[in-house]
Amino acid sequence: MDIFKELILKHTDENVLISPVSILSTLSILNHGAAGSTAEQLSKYIENMNENTPDDNNDMDVDIPYCATLATANKIYGSDSIEFHASFLQKIKDDFQTVNFNNANQTKELINEWVKTMTNGKINSLLTSPLSINTRMTVVSAVHFKAMWKYPFSKHLTYTDKFYISKNIVTSVDMMVSTENNLQYVHINELFGGFSIIDIPYEGNSSMVIILPDDIEGIYNIEKNITDEKFKKWCGMLSTKSIDLYMPKFKVEMTEPYNLVPILENLGLTNIFGYYADFSKMCNETITVEKFLHTTFIDVNEEYTEASAVTGVFMTNFSMVYRTKVYINHPFMYMIKDNTGRILFIGKYCYPQ
């Protein structure tokens, strides 16, 4: 949550999306080559991040069976002019590759092609410009997620509706509709404002959690006040409700990758990127991480595969049931998590692309 909060401070009126699992995985790879105070900082930070995941699920492998695509791309690129220790290379295996940073354009194309392959073409370009020829090591993290809704939205119900970017700025979106579904929902009033939380399940073990402020511009107060502890507390208050859900189709694709170096430095990882960096378990030369790039892509729509295109007739006793209507028509926060509570993605959507 802390990396996300740092990012949204820098991108106040922009869509933001990161994958904490992917970032943590890459930091864990770096930790294999770290020593001294660098290893201490990395180990402490990784431990703190793992405290916010279930005890039995602190490995970086995420299991989302048969129902979703989770394509991740994590890699460390090291200069071919440096001799890296065999013990380090053995630990990280396929996550490391040597390149000639003097051939800047060739290296750029190599990295972009690898990312494109690893994400099944969903992320076509991570690097928009060549890396510096002085680069000695670069960390790259990319991820793409796609899943089928447990309760698919009917395409014929999708309609054009208003989306309030702010109280004074309105645009149009394709609004998806899903009615009479039993979903996990709660409305909460905090000192900083009221908001609704709704848990929308995918087939299998994952779900999307939406935090929708009551006020059109209330997302800023949620951003300032949300913590991992508060999020867990709020999710513990969810209960099953009959919901009519109105949710915009949306797509978030980064035009430029995030360079997380300054953010990670602000969060205490100062001995990774600067003069005091100690990666002596990686190689004998004095090197430091110069870039920590992260990019993401997400596509939220009505789609489902043929395997889930099943028609069923269910008969029940008729009764008058109060249904809660949830209109997601202004900026909101969202998380995609597995059934253990591990957050795979966290994002803010405030500006239709």
From Swiss-Prot:
InterPro entries: Serpin_CS (IPR023795), Serpin_dom (IPR023796), Serpin_fam (IPR000215), Serpin_sf (IPR036186), Serpin_sf_1 (IPR042178), Serpin_sf_2 (IPR042185)
Family annotation (SUPFAM superfamilies): Serpins (SSF56574)
Pfam families: Serpin
PROSITE patterns reported for this sequence: SERPIN (PS00284)
GO molecular function: serine-type endopeptidase inhibitor activity
Record-annotated site: Reactive bond: 318-319
Signal peptide per UniProt: none
CDD domains, per the entry: serpinN_SPI-1_SPI-2
Keywords: Early protein, Host cytoplasm, Protease inhibitor, Serine protease inhibitor
Superkingdom of the source species: Viruses
Subcellular location: Host cytoplasm
GO cellular component: extracellular space; host cell cytoplasm
Family: Belongs to the serpin family. Poxviruses subfamily.
Protein's job: Plays a role in mediating viral host range. May act to inhibit a caspase independent form of apoptosis to allow efficient virus replication in infected cells.
Protein name per its UniProtKB record: Serine proteinase inhibitor 1
Source organism (scientific name): Vaccinia virus (strain Western Reserve)
